[in-house]
Structure formats: structure tokens, C-alpha cells
Amino acid sequence: MDKFLIKMPIKHKNNETPEQKPIVKKETPKAAAKQSNKNTPIQAKEKENAQNDTPKQGRAGRSAKPAAKRKNLDTLEVNTEKNTAESENPPKRRSGRLTRSTRSMAEEGTPSPEKVKPEKLPFIKYRGAIKYFTENQDIAASADDVMQWVDKQTDVDVVPMAFDMEWPFSFQTGPGKSSVIQICVDEKCCYVYQLTNLKKLPAALVALINHPKVRLHGVNIKADFRKLQRDFPEVSADALIEKCVDLGVWCNEICETGGRWSLERLANFIAKKAMDKSKKVRMSKWHVIPLDENQLMYAAIDVYIGQVIYRDLEQREKQKLINELQFKEQNGEAAFKAVKGLGETFLSKINEITL
């Protein structure tokens, strides 16, 4: 009977009403935390209300685990601060969507090399002749000489000619009138014609760029022709566009790359050379006579490297056609289409395969 008398208060301890608060003895922090977990829901709620009413309560007061509903209210401010910090410094996540680069790989097979960070390459050095003319009669005589040289190339049907233009630019007034035309038909000689003193282009120069045997090429060359036609109406942009070659587009066709190219990136990718594209020279006063040495070298290098790139792409195209033909003869049309579908460019010879 004594045993039951001793254990009865312990049995009723959990069934106490809020008014029957037991005398709390000093306990260790660990025991106190354990005891707080054994409180009834009503006691826990009253304890939370008491904690919320205490103005000087710190972070320690929120260390105990409250009821689920009350927890959302108590931690609202903390979550708000956390969300604000995350919005200012969002964590890096892996997106399930296709990025631009992965999309190009999925849809086009090979990402554009122009977007790949180029390695350190040697700068282009041009050691050929630069023939510079500023007057109408001198430009006409020079263009006529080039045209006669083209006519003498009887062993070829097409004579490639690198073509580029320069003009001044102002952030206040925009682009100025076409000031310089530079051409290159031989890697050993470049021609620079300054148009500042010309009201019309010489007939010999117009005849040269429209010569049926001449194939003008460059990067974004169609825009240059439209600009030239606006400044000199005697030039027909449509006629020039029909027979010109955009080196960037041609590179994509042969090398099966994608994207838009600049001359500098094409030089990196095809010729393995770097170009010194000085902004000071590029944005200089191209209409002022005479051009200085830096301007002349800048203009000459643009068409010189264009001619080098054209010759390189020309050789790649020929080799590609040979490799494709040999592969078809050895493996058949079905194998060729299968390998082509896997992304093979045939820029280099591949051995016989078994499917």
C-alpha cells in the first residue's frame, strides 16, 4: 500500500491542469530541455506566449522546438531575412533547360569555335608592299593595272580578291562617309585607295570590283557593299552581293561550325594568328589625308589576312570533297550518311569502318 501512495503523485503529474504547477527544482540545462519536451500542448502554448511577450528575449529563447503552427509565426522574421539574403546572393543551380552552348551542341552538333576562348597566338606580320593612292587619276590607273593582271590569269576561272572598307565614326554623328577601300589579290601586295577627294568612284575601280572573273570576299562584306552604294550611288550593291563570298558563312559550311564570325576570330581559328585590333587606329580619322603608317598597316593587314583565310578555306574544301568521295567508294552511301550524321566533317581522311 505504501508503494501506491508513493507513486500516485508521479502518475498524476502528466494530468495536471495549468493551475496545478509543480514545484520546479533546479535542473541541469540538459534535464530542463528534456522536461520541456514532456509538457502538454497547453503548457507548451502558454510557454510560447510567455516567450513572445518577453521583449529582451534573444536567439536562445527560440532554441526550443515550439508547436508546428506557432513555429511558422515565430520564424517568419528569420525566414524573411534568410530569403532576402538568398535573393541578394542566389545559390548557383544546375538548370535542366538547355543553355545556348548545349543547345547548339544538341541541334548543330558542334559548338562554334568562335565562342571558345582562343589560345595565345602569334600576331600577324605583313612584310609585303602597300600601294597607297589618294587622287582620282592615280586610283584609276592602279585599278586598271590590277584589272590587267586579272585578265592575264588564264589558268583559273576565278580570281579571289579580299575587299574591305574604312570610314570615320563619331558617337555624336554616327558613321561618316566611306573613306578607304583596300583590296588584295596577291599576298605580297595590298592596295589602299583613299576616297576623301573623290566625288565619284573612278570607272576603272567600279569595273574592277564588277569584273566577271573577280570574286570579292570578306567578313560581313554585304554590309560594306550597301554602305558603299549609299555613299557612291554609281555602285550597285545587289550585283556585288550576288557574286561575293562571306568568309564566316563559308567557314561554317566547310568546317560545319555555327555562329557569326569576326575577322579576328577567323584569323585565330583558320590561320592560327592573332590580330592587333587597336581601338585607337580603328576609331581614327580615316578621312584625313594622308594616312599614317599605323593606319596603312591596319588597312593592309585586314585584306592580307582575308586572302590568307580564303586560300586556306579553299584548300580545306577541296580536301573535304576528296575525302568524302573516297569514303563513299569504300563504304557506300548509307555508311557515309550514318557517319555524317554523327558529326564527321571529313576535313581529314578517315579509314574504312564497319557499321
UniProtKB/Swiss-Prot annotation:
Record's SMART domains? 35EXOc
General function of this protein: Has exonuclease activity on both single-stranded and duplex templates bearing overhangs, but not blunt ended duplex DNA, and cleaves in a 3'-5' direction. Essential for the formation of DNA replication focal centers. Has an important role in maintaining genome stability.
Q: Is Transit peptide among the key words of this record?
A: no
Q: Which Pfam families match?
A: DNA_pol_A_exo1
What protein is this chain from?
3'-5' exonuclease
Q: Does the keyword Cell cycle apply?
A: no
**GO CC terms for this protein?**
nucleus
Which residues are modified to Phosphoserine? S104, S112
Q: Which GO terms describe its molecular function?
A: 3'-5' exonuclease activity; metal ion binding; nucleic acid binding
Query: Gene that codes for this?
Result: WRNexo
Concerning InterPro entries, the annotation shows: 3'-5'_exonuclease_dom, 3-5_Exonuclease_domain, RNaseH-like_sf, RNaseH_sf
Q: What is its main location?
A: nucleus
Q: Where is this region: Disordered?
A: 1-119
**Signal peptide stretch:** none
Broad EC category: hydrolase
Instruction: Please state every residue range assigned to the domain named 3'-5' exonuclease.
Output: 154-315
Task: Give the similarity note.
Answer: Belongs to the WRNexo family.
Q: Which CDD domains match?
A: WRN_exo (cd06141)
Q: What is its EC number?
A: 3.1.11.-
> Which controlled-vocabulary keywords does the entry list?
Exonuclease, Hydrolase, Magnesium, Metal-binding, Nuclease, Nucleus, Phosphoprotein
Subcellular location(s): the record lists:
Nucleus
The entry marks the following residues as binding Mg(2+) 2, namely: D164
Q: Which domain of life is it from?
A: Eukaryota
